[in-house]
Each structure stands twice: as C-alpha cells, then as structure tokens.
Amino acid sequence: MEIILKIGILGFGAVFGYLFGEVDLLVKVLVCFIVADYISGLLASGYLGELSSKMGFKGIAKKIAILILVAIAHQIDLILGTHNTTRDAVIFFYLANELISILENFVRMGMKVPEVLKNLILIFDAKSGDEEEKHDKDMD
C-alpha cells in the first residue's frame, strides 16, 4: 500500500510539473492565495449566515479554472519558447484577483484591511502588465 501511495504522489508531481512548469515561488504563492481565498470565502459566508454547498462548488470550480488557465499559459510558453513569461503574467493577474477577493471577504466580516495589502494589489497588477510587455519584447 505504501508503494502505491508513493507512486501516486510521484505521478501527481510529474503531471503537475508538466502542466505548470517549474513549481517556483510564484506557483506556490498562487496555490496559497487560492486556498486562502476559498477559506476566507467560507468564513465570510458562515459569518453572515450565507453558507451554501452550491456557492462552495462554484468557488471550487473557479479555482480549478484558474489552474487550467495557468497550465494553458505554461503550454503556450513552451510552444513560443518564452520561458514562463505568459504563465507568470497570468499568475500575477490571478494573485491580484485572489488578493482582492480575500480582502473583500474580510471586509464582509466587518474587518479593516491594512493599506499595505491594498497596495500589493496594484503591484501584482503592474507585474501582470510588465510580464506581458516583456513577452511582447521577446516576440520582436
């Protein structure tokens, strides 16, 4: 049984690596943001008495869609030979998007949000554009 588990984990890692490329800091942070957004959404919905399995399923579907788009972006980078430029731009876009959602969830619970976190949204958003501009230059 232990061998089957190890083979399964190894297989998952291989597929994950193929789909998303190098599991670098950006990928790890995106996964953390995705999990944090889902949990903060559950907390806010529970806090407000709005928790439902339908909303939970929609949340999971959106998170899977984000990962699919990151995987597609990585595959595009492989085709174009742009070394994760497209993937990183997509990741920065979704980092900003997930951070906005996380902060909104805490505001829904009546919490104040530190300005430094609000400012990070602008930084991630700018990085998303920077990566796209870098990609455009690579194509010239």
From Swiss-Prot:
<protein>
    <recommendedName>
        <fullName>Uncharacterized protein Lin0175</fullName>
    </recommendedName>
</protein>
<keyword id="KW-0472">Membrane</keyword>
<feature type="transmembrane region" description="Helical">
    <location>
        <begin position="26"/>
        <end position="48"/>
    </location>
</feature>
<dbReference type="Pfam" id="PF05105">
    <property type="entry name" value="Phage_holin_4_1"/>
</dbReference>
<dbReference type="InterPro" id="IPR006480">
    <property type="entry name" value="Phage_holin_4_1"/>
</dbReference>
<keyword id="KW-1133">Transmembrane helix</keyword>
<keyword id="KW-1003">Cell membrane</keyword>
<keyword id="KW-0812">Transmembrane</keyword>
<comment type="similarity">
    <text>Belongs to the bacteriophage holin family. Cp-1 holin subfamily.</text>
</comment>
<feature type="transmembrane region" description="Helical">
    <location>
        <begin position="4"/>
        <end position="21"/>
    </location>
</feature>
<dbReference type="GO" id="GO:0005886">
    <property type="term" value="C:plasma membrane"/>
</dbReference>
